[in-house]
């Protein structure tokens, strides 16, 4: 599972380096979550997940408040949640999650990002079956044994608990996201280094150097698209 953590860590580092882009994407995601349910995270689990994720990226409070207020104000701006699947160089598998107010534009942009970088879009279901929806919670200051004991005492299930570098990473079912965080918060954990709902590949692949360079260019092109929220893949990007 360490390679999966490398991919999550590298992705987070990449996004941290593009703060304006990541803030804009979170603003849109917070707005959609707040508009689809109550604007209160206590009663809106989807909104609570987004806000917990936003904390790990240090999204400013002003951006969060602006998105929530926009939703509360009855904005007529609507977004569709769409997932695209495809392949990169050497058959690498890719999932692209989007929030869009123009489906035709988004589909064309995603298709172009694939095709211009050695990839191609697939049909729905062509790669998703090789990924597992997973909650990933990361923290520092405790050992994996301590985290396991905390979760067991709280009767919370986890798929795996691993020590990765200076952090402990908990992998759990998506519906256990809040339960894991709540148990850890009750045990004194105040800050999480990772709080993600992600799609983890069941098997990672390693690409030749030239193919990996092209693949990374394709992923960058996808993530640069305004409507793209998340890009998941099965390539081990290494350290």
Swiss-Prot record:
HAMAP family linked: Transcrip_reg_TACO1 (MF_00693), Transcrip_reg_TACO1_YeeN (MF_00918)
GO cellular component: cytosol
GO molecular function: DNA binding
Listed name of the protein: Probable transcriptional regulatory protein BCQ_0605
Subcellular location: Cytoplasm
GO BP: regulation of DNA-templated transcription
Organism: Bacillus cereus (strain Q1)
Transcription regulation found in the keyword field: yes
Lineage: Bacteria, Bacillati, Bacillota, Bacilli, Bacillales
Keywords: Cytoplasm, DNA-binding, Transcription, Transcription regulation
Family in the record: Belongs to the TACO1 family. YeeN subfamily.
């Amino acid at each position: 599972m360490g390679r999966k953590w490398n991919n999550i860590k590298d992705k987070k580092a990449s996004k941290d380096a593009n703060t304006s882009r990541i803030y804009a994407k979170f603003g849109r995601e917070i707005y959609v979550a707040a508009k689809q349910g109550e604007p209160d995270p206590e009663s809106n689990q989807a909104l609570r997940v987004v806000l917990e994720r936003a904390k790990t990226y240090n999204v400013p409070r002003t951006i969060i408040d602006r998105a929530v207020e926009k939703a509360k104000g009855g904005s007529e701006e609507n977004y569709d949640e769409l997932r695209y699947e495809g392949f990169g160089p050497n058959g690498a598998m890719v999932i692209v999650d989007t929030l869009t107010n123009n489906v035709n534009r988004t589909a064309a942009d995603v298709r172009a990002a694939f095709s211009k970088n050695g990839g191609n879009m697939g049909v729905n279901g062509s790669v998703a079956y090789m990924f597992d929806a997973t909650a990933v919670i990361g923290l520092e200051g405790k050992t994996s044994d301590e985290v396991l004991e905390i979760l067991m005492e709280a009767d919370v299930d986890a798929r795996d608990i691993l020590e990765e570098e200076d952090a402990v990473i908990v992998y759990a079912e998506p519906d256990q996201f809040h339960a894991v965080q709540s148990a850890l918060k009750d045990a004194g954990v105040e800050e999480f280094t990772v709080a993600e709902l992600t799609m983890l590949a069941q098997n990672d692949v390693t690409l030749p150097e030239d193919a990996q360079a092209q693949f990374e260019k394709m992923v960058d092109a996808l993530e640069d698209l305004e409507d793209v929220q998340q890009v998941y893949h099965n390539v081990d990007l290494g350290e």
